[in-house]
Amino acid sequence: GHVRQRDGQIQMFGRDMSRARPHEVSRLGVAYVPEGRGVFPNLSVRENLVMAARRGRDGRDDWPLQRVLQTFPRLQERFDHLGAQLSGGEQQMLSIGRALMTHPALIILDEATEGLAPQVVAEIWRVIGEIRRDGIATLIVDRDYRRVLAQADQALVLQKGQVVLSGAANDVAANAA
C-alpha cells in the first residue's frame, strides 16, 4: 500500500501529486521497484517484461525488451522460467527490467540490493549508473548510504522519520562522515 503524507506537498512536473492515485503517478512516468521484488510469480520472465512495456510519456522508447535483456543477460537465459523459479537476484533484475520497460522519467528503487549476493549488488549498482546516464531521474532508498551518495546529485538522510541532513550529495557525504 501507500502511506498518506501528513503535511507538505509532492510536486512532479509542476503538478501537485499529493492526492494522485497510483495509476495517475504511473502515467506521468514514475516507475517503482519495491522492496521485496514484486514480480508476478506465475508469469514467465518474458510475460513479466512484456506486460509492462509501453512508451514513455514523451514517446521515448530507450529501454525496449532487447536492451533490458542485454543489460541483464541472466534474464535472457531464464526467459521462459516463471518468476517464482528465479533466485532473489534474478527477481530483482526482473523487477528493475520491468520498471525500465515503462520508459520512466523517474524510477524509485526501494532497498534494491537488500539481501542480495555481493556480485548481484555490484551489478544492480552498475545498472543504476547506466539508468542515470540515460537521463532517468532516480530516487534511491537504501541503507548503504555510501553507495547512494556515490551515485546521487542530491541526498536526504532520514533518522526515525525526520530529515537530519539534506543537500548536494558531496556536502551530505562530508557531513555524514
How should these model regions be labeled?
Residues I107-E111:
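Catalytic Walker B motif of ABC-type/P-loop ATPase nucleotide-binding domains
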Residues H103:
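Conserved catalytic motifs of ABC-family nucleotide-binding domains
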Residues A20-P22, V45-L65, T71-Q76, D80, ...:
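ABC-type ATPase nucleotide-binding domains, specifically the catalytic core motifs of the NBD
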Residues A99-L100:
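ABC ATPase C-loop
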